[in-house]
Amino acid sequence: MRGPAVPLTKMEHYLVLTEDIEATKEFYCRALGMHVGFRPPLEFPGYWLYVGDTPCIHIAEWQTYTAHSQRRGIPVSTRAPGTGPFDHIAFNAENFDEVLARLESHGVRPGHNAVTGTSLRQLFLTDPNGVKIEINVRT
């Protein structure tokens, strides 16, 4: 049984906790073409990475973010490698060959999938922290 819907309007962002915020930032900016954008003055190191005008990935240094959260009574994720309790995050793109070439030019060798009976082609890769990323292209 389903109750009343929560009035959600969109997915906003996901947070990657890492020991190396610089390497993580470089991966998303170089391999996926995101850019660093505005981030308010928070009490822990990190970046907000944008696709266009949307800040979709937040990156924070693991230890300082965890300490910050604990001080405020915010639940802290367990330190599981990779994606922890979720499997992956997905993005849409427009040109499969262009995306593949860009990834490969940065040393990323993604897995490929074509969804039978559809025009959907997919790429699967991981960031430097083991977070699995899916890129969907409809041809």
Task: List the model feature ranges, each with a label.
Residues 1-23, 86-91:
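N-terminal beta-strand motif that seeds the catalytic metal site of vicinal oxygen chelate
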Residues 61-64, 137-139:
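Acetyl-CoA-dependent GNAT
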Residues 43, 85, 119:
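Exposed loop/turn and edge beta-strand positions of beta-sandwich/beta-sheet ligand-binding modules
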Residues 38-41, 87, 113-115:
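Short beta-strand
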Residues 63-77:
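Short, flexible, mixed-charge acidic loops at enzyme active sites
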Residues 1-7, 91, 100-139:
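Vicinal oxygen chelate
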Residues 17-57, 61-62, 105:
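Core segments of cupin and vicinal oxygen chelate
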